């Protein structure tokens, strides 16, 4: 999990999985003390239910925990979301490359880490997800090449944003073709 809203969503995912009996480990990429807002509240809830959180603030701590992570059945990528504007560097770049090198399915929250919501280009390393659960509406890099290969299968989670709000946003509008939609045309 990251330190922003995407990480906060990841904390909610971790809590939900634990409550459903799934063995779950949480890693924060960055310094835990920097987490604020809703993400901080969701992190505190993890503490209240006894879920330990491991801080990975540098390359050394990543190397220390990499072997444990390489044994997981699945990885939830909730590191960076729609706020990414520049290519990954340093620890984040290393982490994305290492995760991509594992034969473990990755589920990304909103967008795979390393992709920018504003572009379908891939500027450097980005997580290659098997599945992306994106919030509210599809994002450009999930449906347009060359970035779309990083998103894997895409599920748009309805989070209660009225369609009038989405259609009123500036920029391109995207609609996913679904089986149900095509069925109505045949």
List each model region and its residues.
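YjeF_N-associated NAD(P)HX repair module
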Residues: 71-186
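A cross-family phosphate/adenosyl-ligand binding-site feature
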Residues: 1-75, 80, 87-90
């Amino acid at each position: 999990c990251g330190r922003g809203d995407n990480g906060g969503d990841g904390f909610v995912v971790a809590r939900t999985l634990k409550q459903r009996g799934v063995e779950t480990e949480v890693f924060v990429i960055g310094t835990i003390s920097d987490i604020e807002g809703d993400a901080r509240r969701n992190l505190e809830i993890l503490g209240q239910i006894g879920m330990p959180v491991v801080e990975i603030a540098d390359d050394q701590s990543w190397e220390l925990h990499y072997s444990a992570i390489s044994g997981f059945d699945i990885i939830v990528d909730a590191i960076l979301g729609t706020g990414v504007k520049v290519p990954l560097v340093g620890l984040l770049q290393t982490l994305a490359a290492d995760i991509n090198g594992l034969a473990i399915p990755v589920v990304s929250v909103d967008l795979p880490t390393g992709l920018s919501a504003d572009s379908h280009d891939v500027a450097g390393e980005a997580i290659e997800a098997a599945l992306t659960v994106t919030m509210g509406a599809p994002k450009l890099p999930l449906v347009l090449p060359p970035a779309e290969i990083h998103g894997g299968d895409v599920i748009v989670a309805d989070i209660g944003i009225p369609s009038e709000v989405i259609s009123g946003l500036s920029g391109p509008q995207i609609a996913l073709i679904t089986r149900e939609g095509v069925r109505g045309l045949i």
